[in-house]
Amino acid sequence: MGTPGSGRKRTQIKDRFSAEDEALSHIAREAEARLAAKRAARAEARDIRMRELERQQKELDEKIDKQFTENYSRPSSRNATSGIPGTFTPLSGSSSRRGSGDANSSLDPDASLSELRESLAEVEEKYKKAMVSNAQLDNEKSNLVYQVDTLKDVVEEMEEQMAEYHRENEEKSKELERQKHNCSILQHKLDELKEGIQQRDEFIEKHGLVIIPDGTPNGDINHEPVVGAITVVSQEAAHVLESAGEGPLDVRLRKLAEEKEELVAQIRKLKLQLDDERQRSAKNNSTTTDSTGLENGSDLQLIEMQRDANRQISEYKFKISKAEQDMTTLEQNVMRLEGQVVRYKSAAENAEKVEDELKAEKRRLQRELRTALDKMEEMEMTNNHLVKRLEKMKANRTALLSQQ
């Protein structure tokens, strides 16, 4: 998890999250600017409405005042016309009664005018309060509508993101299941190979074989050692190889081959010496038959010489027979060792191939495991980021609801 690939992925995720946060903050700033502009427009419209209402109220007041002044001026004009001498003389009683009624009416309009003005003031106050409350309700309604639209957009965006994250989660889950299935298959293969190696070791132990490491192939001392290069031989062959000295298997076999050549050369030399001695003995026999008339002293010397020659010949024959036996045993051992070396080299090559395949499978499994862990970490970071964003949006929503 501390790989450079995982670090690059985490930085990419952080950059993507920071870009999303910047985009969201930019959208929020634009929404706040639009809301402020709408509020300013509503305030301006409210001021214009209030000025218009005041103007209408002034016009209404002027109209009512004018109407009341006209109503107040009419009884006085009537009284003036009735007070003209000689106009309606026959109806003096009725005119007197009318004068008293006009006096009462002249007092009643003042009271009715004050009552009307008070009622008008109350109506105006109620009207103003109703207009203000209506404007406030209109503003609150527009704010709530805007908030509802914003929340709807946010909810739709969140639903789309959640659907996308659900799809990604399903894909990642399927990929994880596939990886687990592949891991189980590879684990089964690994168990089978381990069982095969165990059977091989049991076979080697059962037949009394010995594993000889072959660290430097082809007898190259300066060559780097090959990991896992081994050779399996019998115990007798192992003793023979130990007698050849230390070193790689090729070097030991080369030493045995050189010793074999030396022994063959010694045997040839001994055969030549034996032929020479046989020729000498034949010559001595011929000389002994020719010199039968020699003296007894010379005969004794010849007999001694012949005995020595026969003894040497017998010794050489024994050495030659022993060397031939050693040569045959060495040849048999070399042939057997060569066959075993061929077999064990093939077995070692197969084991190396199996081991290389196992190492490759192990490396591939480790890479897949690291990839799966990186993906899981990325998904956890994405999930945590989404949870934080969802909590933030819930907090904003509760704050908006509390402000309402």
Swiss-Prot record:
GO terms for molecular function: LRR domain binding. Residues 69-84, 282-296 have a biased composition (Polar residues). Keywords: Coiled coil, Developmental protein, Wnt signaling pathway. Residues 56-68 have a biased composition (Basic and acidic residues). Residues 27-71, 110-199, 249-397 form a coiled coil. One of its GO terms (biological process) is regulation of DNA-templated transcription. The keyword Plastid does not apply. InterPro entries: LRRFIP1/2. It comes from the Eukaryota. Residues 56-112, 277-296 are annotated as: Disordered. The keyword Ribonucleoprotein does not apply. Pfam families: LRRFIP (PF09738). May function as an activator of the canonical Wnt signaling pathway upstream of ctnnb1/beta-catenin. May be required for dorsal axis formation. Belongs to the LRRFIP family. This is Leucine-rich repeat flightless-interacting protein 2. It comes from Xenopus tropicalis.
